[in-house]
A protein has these predicted regions:
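N-terminal amphipathic alpha-helix/helix-capping segment at the start of soluble metabolic enzymes
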Residues: 1-25, 119-130
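C-terminal helical cap(s) of enzyme catalytic domains, especially alpha/beta-barrels
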Residues: 67, 229-258
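Short beta-strand/loop segments at the ligand-binding rim of alpha/beta enzyme cores
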Residues: 17-23, 67-82, 195-204
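Active-site mouth loops of central-metabolism enzymes
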Residues: 19-35, 82-84, 137-158, 202-208
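Catalytic cores of alpha/beta
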Residues: 80, 84-97, 199, 203, ...
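Glycine-rich phosphate-binding active-site loops on the catalytic face of alpha/beta enzymes
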Residues: 51-57, 98-109, 177-179, 206-207, ...
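Glycine/Thr-rich beta-alpha phosphate-binding loop at enzyme active sites
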Residues: 53, 143-190, 230-238
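Conserved anion-binding
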Residues: 87-166
Length: 331
């Protein structure tokens, strides 16, 4: 499966900045205009991606209308962070096509994905294969997913689970302590997880300050998802300022991290048994993604919705005709 537009955008931003801020809007807690205004403040403050989703209630009309309103106000990718098969809307650019790696129930590992795959394909939004790992305390998402929570003290278990996710095909790994977690996971756990991965790694849960964001990025995370830290700010100016300070801290730590990473030529000399020295074999340059500015194709979505409505109307007419014919036969 080829990378979609949103996934290419993520890789391009990481190559340039070394870290991303992903702002989460939960339509159940921030519906309609309220959620759209918060998303706009986040985008203006420097959020790289707007995530939309939640564990409870983020579906149906509330999800559709809120996401559409957000789309009209921001010009960054909107990625769905689904809580179930109902958390899908055509007004987003992409969806975390997630499986909960440490759930005790097969539903969250494969069944819900089977239910959701045809819907994602019909809507034409880009799926991003995502391995999702729930850490303690887990909060609502841990309870709903019936997760075998990974303790913050066991970075080795988190790393092994993340590695399994990548081997199973995940192109993004997310570890989440749960919405409303009192504090983020320790740097040791973040470092352990990132040390085994070659795909982008995002941390979520408990990160509320620029200082905490700096520590998480320095420990190795490629991005931080923030939701609860923005939910309780009624003043949109304060939301914007908070996002701006966290975004600045993430970008600063990310660029420092990029500087400290060895180049491909240097790596080839460190591990000569596995990679030919650069004087014998020069590694090709990494491809750079020229991602165009995000523009939402409203016409395509409206056309799909109109076609779907026509199909429903035709089915309704068929049903009425069938009912009339059936009643005439009985007479």
């Amino acid at each position: 499966m080829k990378m979609g537009k949103a996934e290419r955008y993520i890789h391009e931003k990481l190559e340039r900045d070394g870290g991303l801020l992903l702002a989460l809007i939960d339509p159940d807690k921030q519906p309609f205009e309220k959620g759209a205004k918060v998303a706009e403040a986040c985008a203006e403050g420097g959020a790289d991606v707007i995530l939309v989703g939640g564990s409870i209630g983020a579906q149906g009309l509330i999800l559709d209308k809120t996401t559409k309103m957000i789309r009209e106000r921001v010009n960054v990718p909107i990625i769905l962070f689904p809580g179930n098969v109902g958390t899908i809307t055509p007004y987003a650019d992409a969806v975390y096509f997630m499986y909960v790696l440490n759930s005790r129930e097969v539903y969250w590992v494969s069944t819900v994905q089977i239910q959701g795959a045809p819907v994602v394909k019909r809507m034409g939004i880009d799926p991003i294969p995502t391995g999702y790992i729930i850490l303690e305390p887990g909060k609502a998402v841990g309870w709903i997913s019936n997760a075998n929570l990974i303790p913050h003290s066991r970075g080795d278990l988190a790393a092994a689970t993340a590695l399994a996710g990548e081997y199973m095909g995940a192109r993004i790994i997310v570890t989440d302590s749960g919405s409303g977690a009192e504090h983020p996971a320790p740097p040791e756990l973040v470092r352990a997880v990132k040390s085994v991965l070659t795909v982008p790694y995002f941390y979520a849960g408990g990160c509320r300050t620029a200082e905490q964001a700096t520590g998480i990025i320095k420990a190795g995370a490629d991005g931080i998802q923030v939701g609860t830290a923005l939910e309780f700010e009624a003043d949109l100016t304060k939301v914007k300022e908070k996002v701006k300070s966290m975004s600045h801290a993430i970008k600063e730590a990310g660029r420092e991290k990029l500087k400290s990473q060895p180049k491909y030529e240097e790596r080839s000399l460190i591990w000569p048994l596995f990679r030919a020295p650069s004087r014998l074999f020069k590694m090709p340059a990494m491809p750079k993604f020229n991602v165009p500015k995000f523009e939402f194709k409203r016409e395509q979505i409206e056309q799909k919705l109109a076609e779907h409505k026509k199909i429903q109307q035709i089915e309704a007419i068929k049903a009425r005709v069938h009912a009339k014919l059936k009643s005439k036969k009985r007479k």
